[in-house]
Amino acid sequence: MSHPLVPQIIKFATPIAKSLGLELVGAVFHTNQHPPILRLDIRHPHQDTGLDDCERMSNAIGEQLDAANIIPEPYLLEISSPGISKFLDNDRDFIAFKGFNVAVNTSEPYKGKNYWIGQLVSRDQTAVYINQKGRQASIPRSLINTVELQEGR
């Protein structure tokens, strides 16, 4: 489930990215972290997105976002790229990478574990489902910090 501030953040960040010749392709606000983490995913439409693109976006938006006071409490800003990050965030990612190996990291232990590895089966409103050696595991979305694509299929 997306944080209620994400649409406002996207509306604010999109023109800034565009002014730098970049595209904003996603935003996630992880409020279960302390301090919360705002991650903006960008891409360069005409070449590979590099660290310099992420740095330019970070420099351009950081102070403006603070001045706009969209997020009233302290937070960390992360700028990344789908080419740099292997994290699955949106429905499109979870559909595209069905059957791929993923690592799921939870904010607190679930069934005694904070780290789950398996093949991605699906995601719905309540959970992410992975296959672990023929057994399906259901991990509540409310506990998930990250779902990261792993090497190999």
Curated annotation (Swiss-Prot):
The keyword Iron does not apply. Keywords: Cytoplasm, Ribosome biogenesis. It comes from the Bacteria. GO terms for biological process: ribosomal small subunit assembly; translation. The keyword Cytoplasm applies. Pfam families: DUF150_C, RimP_N. Disulfide bonds: none annotated. It is found in: Cytoplasm. Coiled coil: none annotated. GO terms for cellular component: cytosol. InterPro entries: Ribosome_maturation_RimP (IPR003728), RimP_C (IPR028998), RimP_C_sf (IPR036847), RimP_N (IPR028989), RimP_N_sf (IPR035956). PANTHER family: RIBOSOME MATURATION FACTOR RIMP. Required for maturation of 30S ribosomal subunits. Belongs to the RimP family. This is Ribosome maturation factor RimP. It comes from Trichodesmium erythraeum (strain IMS101). The lineage of its organism: Bacteria, Bacillati, Cyanobacteriota, Cyanophyceae, Oscillatoriophycideae. The gene is rimP.
